[in-house]
């Protein structure tokens, strides 16, 4: 029995600049580290292809998958032609006793319309074809279950892994705010624009950009993971999906209104900041090492193959 994960292979530019391709590749790398094999595919140009041609291509991709295998599909698959995903799942289901999980990067109908009450879109129907959904966080899982009418088992991953390079810097001015949101106007913020994270992780807090839509408030923040990867505690709005995780593990400051940050920092001592730095340390290492995808992969085996379900699997 083999465990598989899909990986999209785009251009050099895409893998260097497109966040979806970057995260897809890093996830496949993490899965390989825990024993998964990779099914590689490309962003195919299929708009003018006949259904038979699409089926042939998909059949070739799945030629190594055998009965009783497990497959994690990174979803969506980033194909211009919707037939590819549909046929891909249909072909998998023809293989006896194969278990299929979706590593869900985006809920496309909600991303496009910001209508989180829409559970009837054809893309939502595709999600119901899986045996398990690996979703970003519990808030999104609840929304998918309640509004998306998805009754599948779901496992909340927790954080987006971000495999950055470089050594963590010693932290100096703990009242500095590292800010990458162009909407910010607070005087105490230090605006770094596109400065690489490794060059600006020398102290203070990383300000997680506010959610620009209802959908964003239900998804995992890549900026949060970037700050944690460099060892920075964060400032995050209370309405965001990962605010409770930050509060629970003392990874930063949770605020209803960013304007309250002056008062919070005025009352903070260097000892308070050091406690947050210490708390961030283990999470920084986890994000940098691909821990969250690795855990999701191993949990998928436990849930779907071993049929063990306990509190670790948020079903």
Segments and roles (model prediction):
Residues 1-81, 94-99, 313-314:
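N-terminal pre-catalytic "stem/leader" segment of glycosyltransferase-like enzymes
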Residues 258-263, 270-315:
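A charged, aromatic-enriched C-terminal amphipathic alpha-helix characteristic of glycosyltransferases
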Residues 194-229, 236-244:
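Nucleotide-sugar-dependent
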Residues 113-115, 156-178:
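Acidic anion/phosphate-binding donor-loop and adjacent secondary structure
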Residues 186-196:
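Active-site donor-binding acidic/aromatic loop of nucleotide-activated sugar
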Residues 48-129, 135-142:
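Extended catalytic core of nucleotide-activated donor transferases of GT-like folds
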């Amino acid at each position: 029995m083999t465990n598989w994960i899909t990986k999209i292979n785009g251009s050099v530019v895409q893998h260097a600049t497109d966040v979806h391709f970057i995260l897809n590749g890093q996830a496949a790398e993490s899965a390989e580290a825990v024993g998964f094999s990779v099914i590689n595919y490309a962003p195919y140009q299929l708009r003018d292809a006949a259904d038979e041609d699409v089926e042939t291509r998909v059949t070739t991709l799945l030629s190594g998958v055998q009965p009783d295998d497990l497959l994690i599909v990174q979803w969506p698959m980033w194909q211009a032609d919707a037939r590819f995903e549909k046929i891909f799942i249909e072909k998998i289901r023809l293989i006896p006793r194969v278990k299929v999980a979706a590593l869900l990067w985006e809920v496309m109908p909600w991303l496009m319309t910001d209508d989180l009450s829409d559970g009837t879109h054809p893309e939502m129907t595709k999600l119901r074809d899986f045996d398990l959904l690996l979703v970003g966080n519990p808030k999104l899982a609840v929304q998918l279950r309640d509004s998306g009418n998805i009754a599948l088992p779901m496992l909340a991953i927790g954080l987006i892994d971000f495999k950055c390079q470089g050594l963590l810097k010693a932290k100096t001015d703990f009242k500095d705010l590292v800010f990458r949101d162009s909407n910010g106007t607070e005087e105490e913020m230090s605006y770094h624009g596109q400065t690489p994270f490794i060059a600006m992780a020398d102290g203070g807090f990383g300000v997680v950009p506010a959610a620009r839509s209802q959908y964003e408030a239900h998804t995992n923040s890549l900026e949060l993971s970037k700050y944690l990867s460099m060892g920075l505690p964060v400032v995050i709005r209370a309405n965001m999906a990962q605010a409770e995780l930050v509060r629970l593990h003392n990874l930063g400051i949770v605020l209803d209104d960013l304007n309250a940050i002056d008062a919070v920092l005025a009352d903070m001592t260097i000892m308070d900041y050091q406690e947050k730095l210490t708390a961030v340390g283990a999470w920084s290492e986890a994000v940098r090492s691909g821990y969250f995808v690795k855990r999701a992969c191993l949990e998928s085996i436990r849930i779907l193959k071993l049929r063990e379900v306990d509190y670790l699997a948020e079903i």
